[in-house]
Swiss-Prot record:
Source organism of the structure: Arthrospira platensis (Spirulina platensis)
Entry EC number(s): 1.14.19.46
Annotated pathway: Lipid metabolism; polyunsaturated fatty acid biosynthesis
Signal peptide start-end: none
Residue ranges annotated as motif Histidine box-1: 89-93
Main location group: membrane
BP GO annotations: unsaturated fatty acid biosynthetic process
Protein keywords: Cell inner membrane, Cell membrane, Fatty acid biosynthesis, Fatty acid metabolism, Iron, Lipid biosynthesis, Lipid metabolism, Membrane, Oxidoreductase, Thylakoid, Transmembrane, Transmembrane helix
Protein's name in the database: sn-1 linoleoyl-lipid 6-desaturase
Name of the gene this protein is made from: desD
Annotated domain remarks: The histidine box domains are involved in binding the catalytic metal ions.
Family: Belongs to the fatty acid desaturase type 2 family.
Domain of life: Bacteria
Motif window: Histidine box-2: 124-129
Function field: Desaturase involved in fatty acid biosynthesis. Introduces a double bond at carbon 6 of linoleoyl group (18:2) attached to the sn-1 position of the glycerol moiety of membrane glycerolipids, leading to the formation of gamma-linolenic acid (GLA).
Amino acid sequence: MTSTTSKVTFGKSIGFRKELNRRVNAYLEAENISPRDNPPMYLKTAIILAWVVSAWTFVVFGPDVLWMKLLGCIVLGFGVSAVGFNISHDGNHGGYSKYQWVNYLSGLTHDAIGVSSYLWKFRHNVLHHTYTNILGHDVEIHGDELVRMSPSMEYRWYHRYQHWFIWFVYPFIPYYWSIADVQTMLFKRQYHDHEIPSPTWVDIATLLAFKAFGVAVFLIIPIAVGYSPLEAVIGASIVYMTHGLVACVVFMLAHVIEPAEFLDPDNLHIDDEWAIAQVKTTVDFAPNNPIINWYVGGLNYQTVHHLFPHICHIHYPKIAPILAEVCEEFGVNYAVHQTFFGALAANYSWLKKMSINPETKAIEQLTV
């Protein structure tokens, strides 16, 4: 997939990316490590899929005890996010396997959890990874103007409260994804000024088939085995609201956070070479937390991921020190929050900063 031609260009290489690639390749060769097709990733995939299937089975067919059902739905919601973070993400980036059919099947798990892999690969792989934190190009920081993530975004009165209400918006995002996917693929066919490559009938059929799959798994089957329609809707809502909260928080901690930079969308040329711009617009978090490392599929090493999306995420903890060395040598700040809650606080701080009307702030500065 390719994007429409963009006027945004990046600076000439100063050797940063070349040197980083050289050292990472040297590490992989010295340790005889394959960047993809790794047995630990296969095992992880099996564990996550077993988690999701067993949680769903427990919720639908398990003991008829309310608190167990509710807990099971939450556990299933965390499992759905784990599928997206690990299996779907690596597959759709081509980082799961050297075999494209394996990546394709892994990527289809995105469709299975409610997100079109076809649209995701364009929106995320092309637009987000190329134009990270550039408003008007990076769809993932746009937020449909409900939340002001970038200083370049027009301020609206309700942004004043965004650092409070955003936590109540996250759980509903999966519903938005499901509806927006259909609207975008069938009718809209573009993100901002970027035209989406025309989907084939197979792409459209895949989209609709998996939307139907979601309805069957979370509504039709539960109702068929004896749950009321209301009970089925409540259960599905708990699952997907849990998934939405978890997925959105993890994304925000990578880019919508201090000290990540937001590049000026009116500047058609970025002075930095692309790889350096990626480092400046991205932040890692909780690198020494083994639970987070395993669960979020390396997305806490988001900077490493943006530079090496084609490498399986299980290698990111070893690549991160190499990146840190190269950044230090080239005078590039490699931002890392050491804890999850430290990153969460930095994200909240940024959202609060963006909640201030820039015109009011400018007037206050003039009167000082």
